[in-house]
Amino acid sequence: MNKAFFLCLVVLCAAVVFAAEDLQKGKHAPFKRAAPCFCSGNPGRGDLWILRGPSPGGYGYTSNCYKWPNICCFPP
């Protein structure tokens, strides 16, 4: 019984270590809280930010169009 308990404990610890390592990789992935949108006069797909005034910084947006009360922001 002690050997089985020890083996389960080792497997549990290994699973926690590998899960934590996988979560560390996920932290560096970019994540936007925006929906896709389209505006006439702007090529391609933009990001629709709901109930927001200007385009948020840090995402590299170069142009936008307003769809009141939302904004559609376009990357370069």
From Swiss-Prot:
Any one GO biological process: regulation of blood pressure
**A Pfam family assignment:** Defensin_4
Which positions carry the propeptide annotation? 20-31
Q: Which Gene3D superfamilies match?
A: Anthopleurin-A
* Signal sequence bounds: 1-19
What is the protein's given name? Kappa-actitoxin-Avd4n
Entry keywords, A to Z: Cleavage on pair of basic residues, Disulfide bond, Hypotensive agent, Ion channel impairing toxin, Nematocyst, Neurotoxin, Potassium channel impairing toxin, Secreted, Signal, Toxin, Voltage-gated potassium channel impairing toxin
Gene Ontology, cellular component aspect: extracellular region; nematocyst
Q: What function is annotated for this protein?
A: Blocks Kv3 voltage-gated potassium channels. Reduces blood pressure.
Disulfide cross-links: 37-72, 39-65
Gene Ontology terms for molecular function: ion channel inhibitor activity; potassium channel regulator activity; toxin activity
Q: Which family does it belong to?
A: Belongs to the sea anemone type 3 (BDS) potassium channel toxin family.
Where does tissue-level expression of this protein occur? Experimental results show no expression in the ectodermal tissue from the distal and proximal tentacles, body wall, and oral disk. Since paralogs are expressed in this tissue, an expression of this toxin in this tissue is probable. The negative results could be explained by the very low abundance of EST sequences.
Question: What's the main place this protein lives?
Answer: secreted
Task: Supply the source organism for this entry.
Answer: Anemonia viridis (Snakelocks anemone)
Places the protein is found: Secreted; Nematocyst
